[in-house]
């Protein structure tokens, strides 16, 4: 059976603003501002859409009224993994911790993220206040690459993240704080275990 690949997003807290843009890598790369993207509200979102506000002005915003939010997610279907770029901006209105962080699934074997899935994701925060790339097999996450600790301090900054997977299974990710003019290449790692 062919694994269904979904670009997905999982959020483990309240009030996350996400500006989302996904495209194939271009030779003449345009480093435009992800905030200018107006396609977010037009994407075919699935999952717990009642917990999110989705519009072209704010992008995707977690709006779960529960005090103890737990896990909330929305997904969009896709067949692309290799030779693909994911690019998005995030503003967390909380200071991430070991128990309070955000996950953005780039690929997943299921559009239901509350169980066993195979896929790759970016995690913001956690035991370290960094951005990291993980592979998940079933319920077991494996850290593939860890970036700089950009989420330290009391105020969580606005952060832009770019991830690419090439045809050979090399994953590369970059980060850029709102105060920075250019992306910083964090890591590159080869992993095509579940591609």
Please tell me what each predicted stretch does.
Residues 88, 154-194:
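Carbohydrate-binding surfaces in secreted/extracellular proteins
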């Amino acid at each position: 059976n062919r694994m269904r690949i979904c670009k997905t997003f999982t959020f483990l807290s309240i009030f996350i603003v996400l500006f989302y843009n996904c495209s194939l890598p271009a030779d003449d790369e345009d480093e435009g501002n992800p905030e200018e993207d107006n396609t977010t509200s037009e994407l075919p979102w699935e999952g717990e859409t009642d917990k999110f506000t989705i519009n072209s002005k704010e992008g995707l915003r977690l709006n779960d009224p529960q005090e103890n939010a737990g896990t909330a997610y929305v997904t969009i279907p896709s067949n692309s993994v290799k030779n693909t770029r994911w690019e998005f901006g995030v503003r967390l209105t909380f200071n991430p911790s070991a128990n309070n962080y955000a996950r953005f699934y780039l690929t997943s074997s299921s559009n239901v993220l509350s169980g066993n899935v195979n896929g790759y994701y970016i995690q913001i925060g956690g035991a370290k206040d960094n951005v990291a790339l993980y592979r998940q097999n079933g319920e077991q996450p494996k850290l593939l690459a860890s970036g700089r600790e950009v989420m330290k301090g009391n105020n969580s900054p606005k952060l832009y993240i770019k991830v690419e997977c090439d045809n050979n299974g090399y994953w590369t990710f970059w980060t850029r704080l709102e105060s920075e003019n250019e992306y910083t290449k964090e890591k590159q790692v080869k992993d095509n275990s579940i591609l």
